[in-house]
């Protein structure tokens, strides 16, 4: 599995700001969008382009535009919604697929409760977004659903990842790509990433 930790100074700075204990909901949302945007920039670096001729202000001009498979953005509910706008800044025509999965706090296992995936997902590149890759259970379950629908081009974008989650994801889906703003130290006994960001969903939705 290709794992990319984006070490751009802007990314490192913004993730650092997100770690503040008393960060406001407004600021956390803004930063989640901004970092999601920067991760999208990295994750799409290998997208193919084609040369076309258009009518410019002073006559015909040759430009490059994206070609090949179109994109579906797949936020994992609910926290993944906090990164979605950052992806759509670069890919405004992307279709949106939604997967609802929550983590059982006792077993730490993923529990699916909702899915609405575009009908032609097998023809698209899926960008799966979720702020935290902790145990990896929710991401693995989401990718399982996408593959069952025939999707073969999948990239996962997360703000923070734990080594344990990366290992689990690689074992389950070695053919995908993972882009993260930070690989943190470890998980604690409750399955939270250390140093992490806290509960990203609560911070995005103001329910902390």
Swiss-Prot record:
<dbReference type="GO" id="GO:0005525">
    <property type="term" value="F:GTP binding"/>
</dbReference>
<dbReference type="GO" id="GO:0004845">
    <property type="term" value="F:uracil phosphoribosyltransferase activity"/>
</dbReference>
<dbReference type="InterPro" id="IPR050054">
    <property type="entry name" value="UPRTase/APRTase"/>
</dbReference>
<dbReference type="GO" id="GO:0000287">
    <property type="term" value="F:magnesium ion binding"/>
</dbReference>
<feature type="binding site">
    <location>
        <begin position="198"/>
        <end position="200"/>
    </location>
    <ligand>
        <name>uracil</name>
    </ligand>
</feature>
<keyword id="KW-0021">Allosteric enzyme</keyword>
<dbReference type="Pfam" id="PF14681">
    <property type="entry name" value="UPRTase"/>
</dbReference>
<feature type="binding site">
    <location>
        <position position="78"/>
    </location>
    <ligand>
        <name>5-phospho-alpha-D-ribose 1-diphosphate</name>
    </ligand>
</feature>
<comment type="pathway">
    <text>Pyrimidine metabolism; UMP biosynthesis via salvage pathway; UMP from uracil: step 1/1.</text>
</comment>
<keyword id="KW-0342">GTP-binding</keyword>
<protein>
    <recommendedName>
        <fullName>Uracil phosphoribosyltransferase</fullName>
        <ecNumber>2.4.2.9</ecNumber>
    </recommendedName>
</protein>
<keyword id="KW-0328">Glycosyltransferase</keyword>
<comment type="similarity">
    <text>Belongs to the UPRTase family.</text>
</comment>
<dbReference type="GO" id="GO:0044206">
    <property type="term" value="P:UMP salvage"/>
</dbReference>
<feature type="binding site">
    <location>
        <position position="193"/>
    </location>
    <ligand>
        <name>uracil</name>
    </ligand>
</feature>
<keyword id="KW-0460">Magnesium</keyword>
<dbReference type="GO" id="GO:0006223">
    <property type="term" value="P:uracil salvage"/>
</dbReference>
<keyword id="KW-0547">Nucleotide-binding</keyword>
<dbReference type="InterPro" id="IPR005765">
    <property type="entry name" value="Ura_phspho_trans"/>
</dbReference>
<comment type="function">
    <text>Catalyzes the conversion of uracil and 5-phospho-alpha-D-ribose 1-diphosphate (PRPP) to UMP and diphosphate.</text>
</comment>
<feature type="binding site">
    <location>
        <position position="199"/>
    </location>
    <ligand>
        <name>5-phospho-alpha-D-ribose 1-diphosphate</name>
    </ligand>
</feature>
<keyword id="KW-0808">Transferase</keyword>
<feature type="binding site">
    <location>
        <position position="103"/>
    </location>
    <ligand>
        <name>5-phospho-alpha-D-ribose 1-diphosphate</name>
    </ligand>
</feature>
<dbReference type="InterPro" id="IPR034332">
    <property type="entry name" value="Upp_B"/>
</dbReference>
<dbReference type="InterPro" id="IPR029057">
    <property type="entry name" value="PRTase-like"/>
</dbReference>
<feature type="binding site">
    <location>
        <begin position="130"/>
        <end position="138"/>
    </location>
    <ligand>
        <name>5-phospho-alpha-D-ribose 1-diphosphate</name>
    </ligand>
</feature>
<dbReference type="InterPro" id="IPR000836">
    <property type="entry name" value="PRibTrfase_dom"/>
</dbReference>
């Amino acid at each position: 599995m290709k794992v990319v930790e984006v070490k751009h100074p802007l990314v490192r700075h913004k993730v650092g700001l997100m770690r503040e204990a008393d960060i406001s909901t407004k600021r956390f949302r803004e930063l989640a969008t901004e970092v999601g945007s920067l991760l999208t920039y990295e994750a799409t670096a290998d997208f193919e382009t084609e040369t076309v001729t258009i009518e410019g202000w002073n006559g015909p001009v040759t430009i490059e535009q994206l070609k090949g498979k179109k994109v579906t953005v797949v936020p994992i509910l609910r926290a993944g919604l906090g990164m979605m706008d950052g992806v759509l800044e670069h890919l405004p025509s992307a279709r949106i697929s939604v997967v609802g999965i929550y983590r059982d706090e006792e077993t730490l296992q993923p529990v699916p409760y909702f899915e609405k995936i575009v009908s032609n997902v097998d023809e698209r590149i899926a960008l799966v977004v979720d702020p935290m890759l902790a145990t990896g259970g929710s991401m693995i379950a989401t990718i399982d659903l996408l593959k069952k629908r025939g999707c073969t081009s999948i990239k996962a974008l997360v703000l923070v990842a734990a080594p344990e989650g990366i290992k689990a994801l690689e074992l389950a889906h070695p053919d995908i790509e993972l882009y993260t703003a930070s690989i943190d130290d470890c998980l604690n006994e409750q399955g939270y990433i250390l140093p992490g960001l806290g509960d990203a969903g609560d911070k995005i939705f103001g329910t902390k």
